[in-house]
């Protein structure tokens, strides 16, 4: 079995507890929950580690791609391993980050993974640690800003190497997969289906 959700932002317990997700009673570690970005790797706090241990103890395997709200300093420091045909980071033995531009075979289906997205909650800018405006702006509920390497990472957007690797991996399988897992679709596609509501950056 495979279940897909998104944007857990580190709150795995409320989303994936048995009361919210009773299907897990029939699941094993050979069944999967895929989280489509904004998984919630954030600060290595005791609470986050506790929650990850809780997730590891669930009967299923958790897979996730990155979104625009992840701590890329933590993710990028992890060793790169191979799993089911593609590159991954193991957060726990059964909590696995599926890296960008990869093709995985999971439950006899092929999945192309490409995480990342551009943050839209940064209208007032990206500030550096120590910027005196942080204290003042933090009190203003209308200020939309982030702090570099604290609450925002440039790595939220894919780089050319990741895009090239994705193209190469897709070519190896004649550009055919069963599923594409992404945090945010291409701007051109979103614009097409939004009936004029979506305004690209």
PLM features per residue range, with description:
Residues 1-3:
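Extreme N-terminal starter segment of soluble prokaryotic enzymes
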Residues 5, 10-106, 199-200:
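Core catalytic region of metal-dependent phosphoesterases/phosphodiesterases
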Residues 109-196:
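Active-site-proximal loop/helix segment associated with metal-binding centers of metalloenzymes
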């Amino acid at each position: 079995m495979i279940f897909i959700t998104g944007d857990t932002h580190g709150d795995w317990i409320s989303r994936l507890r048995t009361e919210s997700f009773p299907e897990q009673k029939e699941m094993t570690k050979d069944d999967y929950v895929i989280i489509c970005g904004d998984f919630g790797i954030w600060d290595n706090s005791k609470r986050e580690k506790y929650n990850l241990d809780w997730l590891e103890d669930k009967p299923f395997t958790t897979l996730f791609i990155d979104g625009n709200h992840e701590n890329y300093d933590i993710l990028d420091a992890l060793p790169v391993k191979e799993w089911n045909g593609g590159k991954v980071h193991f957060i726990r033995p059964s909590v696995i980050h599926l890296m960008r531009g990869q093709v995985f075979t999971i439950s006899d289906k092929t999945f192309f993974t490409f995480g990342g997205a551009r943050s839209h909650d940064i209208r007032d800018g990206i500030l550096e640690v120590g910027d005196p405006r942080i204290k003042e702006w933090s009190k203003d509920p209308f200020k939309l800003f982030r702090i570099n390497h604290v609450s925002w990472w440039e790595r939220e957007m894919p780089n050319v190497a990741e895009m090239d690797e994705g193209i190469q991996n897709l070519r190896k399988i004649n550009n055919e997969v069963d599923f594409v897992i992404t945090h945010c679709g291409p701007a051109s596609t979103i614009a097409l289906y939004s009936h004029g509501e979506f305004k690209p950056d």
